[in-house]
Each structure stands twice: as structure tokens, then as C-alpha cells.
Amino acid sequence: MKMPLTWGSWFLLSAWILNAGAEISITPEPAQPAEGDNVTLVVHGLSGELLAYNWYAGPSISLTFLVASYIVSTGDETPGPAHTGREAVRPDGSLDIHGALPGHTGTYILQTLNRQFQTEVGYGHMQVYEILAPPTVMANDTALVERRDTLRLICSSPSPAEVRWFFNGDALPVAVRLGLSPDGRMLTRHGVRREEAGAYQCEVWNPVSVSRSEPLNLTVYFGPERVAILQDSTTRTGCTIKVDFNTSLTLWCVSRSCPEPEYVWAFNGKALKNGQDHLNISSMSADHEGTYTCIAKNSKTLLSGSASVVVKLSAAAVAMMIVPVPTKPMEGQDVTLTVQGYPKDLLVYAWYRGPASEPNRLLSQLPSGNWIAGPAHTGREVGFANCSLLVQKLNLTDAGRYTLKTVTLQGKTDTLEVELQVA
């Protein structure tokens, strides 16, 4: 009486009867399946009339790794301990895996039994590739100081995959790739450079899937460098800037710096109340002659730099002259009769309404620096150390000729006239 063949009985038989001439091979279709694909482990090289198949998912023939046993004559399939609920054996011995998962990756063994109760064994390997989720770029810091700080970027992904890096949308430059770890997941740059500031991304990939991270933006602080003072926001630079009397001048402080530096201006060594990148002189006079210095300070790098320039009246402005400011004053306004090129060794001066005679004297300045009112003073005139005369709240009767008389320490006397018009 023949005993029926069961998976348990033939598993025991197969453990000791082996046909040494086995040439069975196993290949997956598709060859590089993605997770979720239906995969068939196709068997090649089967010979003779076969009674049964055993499929194993593991490195050896062991009950622990048994996926399923299949009886050819009846079509009965019995799942084993390693069956995941997705496997099915075909009559030709191939194994279908429905919706394969990365966990199905590994070695597969097919064991066959023929009518002589001999077994043959075939081996194959299958790699199920994940559909990769976007990785994340993590940094030790996203704002670093040039040549001082170290940059460390990590491409974080839960999946085993190849890694590529991108910088500002392009493949990472060769020089930067030198800082990659062997697995490509960590990028290290000692003494980071300004040209390495930008957007970094990493991309994970396998034969069936590619996924790129969101960009991580890196800022590299540097400077200030090449601090310079420009005239009127142009490229005109130099140690000395010559300006015509009563004209305007704008000095611009420029530098190469990230972030934009803080600015401090000084005039002849004395700090000015100006925190801007430019300094305006609205009406050039002898009082504005001197050395202007701009100091640029970077709060991130803790570095600073400075530049200086000498501002002088132009040669054409050296001769003494009087210019009303504003040039066309209106009734009710104040006007300053500004003196250009007044003597540096001035002893005294006097202003007159009309010709230089005592009854017409408005005011005069004494060697002490104080000024005293003259017979023609109306109470609206004020004198300054630079010889200028302020006339307040003009009326139409203030129009006419004004005369300035100066005396130097050497006794040189000069007289200068100006015609004031009041609109």
C-alpha cells in the first residue's frame, strides 16, 4: 500500500536524498523589482517528472525558512513558517510574490523531488527596492564664519540607498566632494569659504527610485574687506577730494562683507552721529575741510576695517568770496552770507550795510571771538567765526549791498562786497 506524499514526509526525505547533478537556476522577473511589484521567481533547468517542490526564503534548507510545499499531482500547496501570505507556487515550480516588500529581499532556494525520490536544489537572489522617501539635510549650523568654522552636513534617510549631493541645483563640485564620508552621507568642510554659501540638497537613489531633499541654505559670514570711501557713489577714490565752495558732497563707505557691516564716521578723529553707509555735506565750506574716516564693523565675524579721505576746497575756491545761502532768499526767510576762503590768520572783521563806513556797520568780531553790534544793527544779524553773516526774517528793505572788511594778524586788510536780493 502506497502512503500519500505529504509536505512533512517529503521534507524529511529531501533532507537526505540529493541528486548531485542539479543545474537549477532562479531569476526574478522583473529583474529589479520595486516594493509593491508582483514578482515571479522563474525556475530554469528543471528536468524529469517531478512530484513536489519546496521553496525556502533563507540561506539554507531549513524548516524555519520554508515558504511553501507544493504537490504537483494534486496542486496542493502548504504554507511553511516563512510564508508571508503573499507567496504562491505555480505548477511549473515558479514562485509568485504578490506586492513584494523590501523584506522579501534575500536568498531563495527551490528544492525539487522526482519519482526516484531524488532531490535537486536551485539558488537565486532577489533584491526588492524601496520607493524612497525624500531625505533631509541636517547641518551643525546654517550660518558660519569664513575660515573659522567647520561645516558638517548629514543626509538623513531611513533607507539604504546611494547618495548624491547638489549645490545650488548642480552636482556638488569636485573640490567639495573631497569632504564626503565613504558612504557619501556626511559632508565636512573645515574652514568653510564664502563661495561655499548657497543651497545644499542630497538625493537618495536606487535602481527603481530617486528622491531629493528640500534645499538647506548656508550663509557664510566674512569681512569687512577692501573698505573704501567713494565720492558721490562713483568709483572715484583717492587720498584727497577737492570740492568747490558751497557745493554738495556725498561720501560713500563701501566694503565686501556679509552681513552688511555697521558704519561709524569720524571727522578729524572725532566721531560723528551717523550710522549710515554715506555722509552728506550739503554746502562745502572751509569748516568742512579735514580728514573723514569710515569704520566698518561686522557683528558676526567681529572684524572691522577702515578707510580715510581728505576733503579740501578746490583751488578755485581759495580766493575769498561771499555766497548767499539760499542764493535767492524770499521775504520772511533767513539768509546766510557765507564767506569762502576767509583768512586763516584772521584778527578782526566787520560787516557793513552799504559801503564800509562807521554809520553803516552792522557788527564786528573782536580777537576774543565775540562780536559786537554796530550802529546799523537791527537785532536780526548774527556773526560767526568764519566771517559769515546771518540775517534773520528778511524783509524787502534788507535787499542791497553788503560789505565785509577783514584784517589779518599781519595787518593785511581786504574788502569784499555782495549784492543781496530779496524776492
Swiss-Prot record:
GO molecular function, one term: identical protein binding
Protein name listed in UniProt: Cell adhesion molecule CEACAM16
Subcellular location: Secreted
GO CC terms, sorted: extracellular space; stereocilium tip
Gene Ontology process terms (BP): sensory perception of sound
Entries under PANTHER family matching the protein: CARCINOEMBRYONIC ANTIGEN-RELATED CELL ADHESION MOLECULE 1, CARCINOEMBRYONIC ANTIGEN-RELATED CELL ADHESION MOLECULE 19
Upper lineage: Eukaryota, Metazoa, Chordata, Craniata, Vertebrata
Residue ranges annotated for the Ig-like C2-type domain, each copy included: 134-219, 224-310
Organism expressing this protein natively: Rattus norvegicus
